[in-house]
Amino acid sequence: MASESGKLWGGRFVGAVDPIMEKFNASIAYDRHLWEVDVQGSKAYSRGLEKAGLLTKAEMDQILHGLDKVAEEWAQCTFKLSPNDEDIHTANERRLKELIGETAGKLHTGRSRNDQVVTDLRLWMRQTCSTLSGLLWELIRTMVDRAEAERDVLFPGYTHLQRAQPIRWSHWILSHAVALTRDSERLLEVRKRINVLPLGSGAIAGNPLSVDRELLRAELNFGAITLNSMDATSERDFVAEFLFWASLCMTHLSRMAEDLILYCTKEFSFVQLSDAYSTGSSLMPQKKNPDSLELIRSKAGRVFGRCAGLLMTLKGLPSTYNKDLQEDKEAVFEVSDTMSAVLQVATGVISTLQIHRENMGQALSPDMLATDLAYYLVRKGMPFRQAHEASGKAVFMAETKGVALNELSLQELQTISPLFSGDVSCVWDYGHSVEQYGALGGTARSSVDWQIRQVRALLQTQQA
């Protein structure tokens, strides 16, 4: 049990710890997030001790009852921290002793805070991954529903931020939804690797007291058991993977936010954010600022920083547990909170977004059909490279004459290639343009419908 100082490790120390060091060393301010899973892990471990003959049935029941009381106090916000509670494990064990007496000292038999904390963290992150998966699926569903409802809306697609080709608005939505399905799949994979039990590894060498780790695994519903006690207590691959998942997901969300920030400017006027996700200016009354999207974009940087910071912490550590690993939890808690907020705000933005169909249509221009003009010649038998050059000459001719590409006469086009004929007029129809891209993954309606079905099927599979 704890020494007179209240420390779980104080037996070989003489004198008090410097108060500045006390504060520097403590993690209770943030690892209190783990109170519930710490109790959960301790209850499972007490059952393991009872099976190993290290606790009597009465002692186990006493500990379990005491842990239930500890959990009740946390849940009701009546748990009182002590100045000596340097972390959640110390706090819970100290309170357990106050409730049930010296029997509490048997709970830590064969267990180290090294395997205890990493078990707690895996339990907490496992639940967090499930919660975030649900939020991410809801965002993707919202996007797919919107894509299905607005399939007939056309607007300019951009490359290099220059107008490129006509596409369906739904095609743009789905481009981001598909990226997010990879994120949702990746998060499930991260959760699978989180779901491995380290409890029973001790500090470094393992557990010498015949504690049944399979029992612990079943009690805590883990999918597997760690293979090596040294690796189990010191590796934080699962934390790094989670932070990388968040970084990549935020990359995708930030890019979508950037598109929408541009689209809602007066210069584009393709979309309008709901007032619920906008703010105003303290000086300029006319302003409607896309703060929700700007914050999504900026919070990506915070998440990246947490990921990079953890990797910098891990890369120089010697084998097994080092106190440096205390830094992992703040990163996990902050990023989890950020991702939860971002996913919910993004869902709200997408579900309430207003589109300006007329402005989208007016932004389409004949020069965006230059590629279609080349395809017209390809269908007439011209090799694509020659067709590309011929279309480029038509663009140059229109620019020289100061007219739109579709205003060139048939005779003028025929000076470029005799393959041009009266049916070239069909090239200038935007609806015809998007419908020719019928290959799977394209912007034709049939392909967009296929994409919608595929994304919904992916979601169904992931949620199974």
From Swiss-Prot:
Record-listed N6-acetyllysine modification sites: K7, K69, K288
Site entry: Increases basicity of active site His: E294
Keywords from the UniProt entry: Acetylation, Amino-acid biosynthesis, Arginine biosynthesis, Lyase, Urea cycle
Catalytic residues, chain numbering: H160, S281
Similarity annotation: Belongs to the lyase 1 family. Argininosuccinate lyase subfamily.
Domain of life where this protein originates: Eukaryota
Residues that bind 2-(N(omega)-L-arginino)succinate: S27, N114, T159, N289, Y321, Q326, K329
Activity regulation: Enzyme activity is regulated by acetylation.
Stored HAMAP family: Arg_succ_lyase (MF_00006)
Name of the gene: ASL
Modification after translation, per record: Acetylation modifies enzyme activity in response to alterations of extracellular nutrient availability. Acetylation increased with trichostin A (TSA) or with nicotinamide (NAM). Glucose increases acetylation by about a factor of 3 with decreasing enzyme activity. Acetylation on Lys-288 is decreased on the addition of extra amino acids resulting in activation of enzyme activity.
CDD domains per record: Argininosuccinate_lyase (cd01359)
InterPro entries, A to Z: Arg_succ_lyase_C (IPR029419), Argininosuccinate_lyase (IPR009049), Fumarase/histidase_N (IPR024083), Fumarate_lyase_CS (IPR020557), Fumarate_lyase_fam (IPR000362), Fumarate_lyase_N (IPR022761), L-Aspartase-like (IPR008948)
GO aspect biological process, one term: urea cycle
EC primary class: lyase
Enzyme Commission number(s): 4.3.2.1
Function: Catalyzes the reversible cleavage of L-argininosuccinate to fumarate and L-arginine, an intermediate step reaction in the urea cycle mostly providing for hepatic nitrogen detoxification into excretable urea as well as de novo L-arginine synthesis in nonhepatic tissues. Essential regulator of intracellular and extracellular L-arginine pools.
Pathway terms, separated by semicolons: Amino-acid biosynthesis; L-arginine biosynthesis; L-arginine from L-ornithine and carbamoyl phosphate: step 3/3; Nitrogen metabolism; urea cycle; L-arginine and fumarate from (N(omega)-L-arginino)succinate: step 1/1
Protein name per the record: Argininosuccinate lyase
Record's subunit section: Homotetramer. Forms tissue-specific complexes with ASS1, SLC7A1, HSP90AA1 and nitric oxide synthase NOS1, NOS2 or NOS3; the complex maintenance is independent of ASL catalytic function.
Any single GO CC term annotated in Swiss-Prot or TrEMBL for this entry: cytosol
Catalytic reactions of this protein: 2-(N(omega)-L-arginino)succinate = fumarate + L-arginine
